[in-house]
Amino acid sequence: MELAEIVMNPVRQRIFQYFLLHETGTVKEIRKALPDIPGASLYRHIKILADSSILMVVDENRIRGTVESVYQIK
C-alpha cells in the first residue's frame, strides 16, 4: 500500500489527528476519543499505520495477562 493511500483513508486521518493532539495513546484511549469507530476497525487501521512505520510502539503495559501497546507517531 502506498503512503498516500494509507494516509488518505478518513479513519486513519482521524487516528492521526488524535496523535497530533495527544503525544501517545493506547487503543483503549483512542476508542474513548473516537467512539463512532468500531473496535475491530480501529485495531485494523492502527495495525496498518504501525506496519507502515507511521506509528510506533513506545511502551507496553501488562494488564491481566495481555499486553496493551502504547503508540506514538514516528
Annotate the PLM regions.
Residues 37-39:
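Short coil turns linking two alpha-helices in DNA-binding domains
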Residues 18-22:
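Short amphipathic alpha-helical elements of helix-turn-helix/winged-helix folds
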Residues 5-11, 26, 56, 60-74:
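Short, cationic-aromatic polyanion-contact patches
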Residues 46-47:
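Short, hydrophobic-biased segments on the C-terminal half of alpha helices
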Residues 13-17:
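Pre-recognition alpha-helix immediately N-terminal to the DNA-recognition helix
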Residues 29-33:
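A short acidic, leucine-rich amphipathic alpha-helix
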Residues 53:
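Glycine-centered, phosphate/nucleic-acid-interacting loop/turn motifs that mediate DNA/RNA or nucleotide
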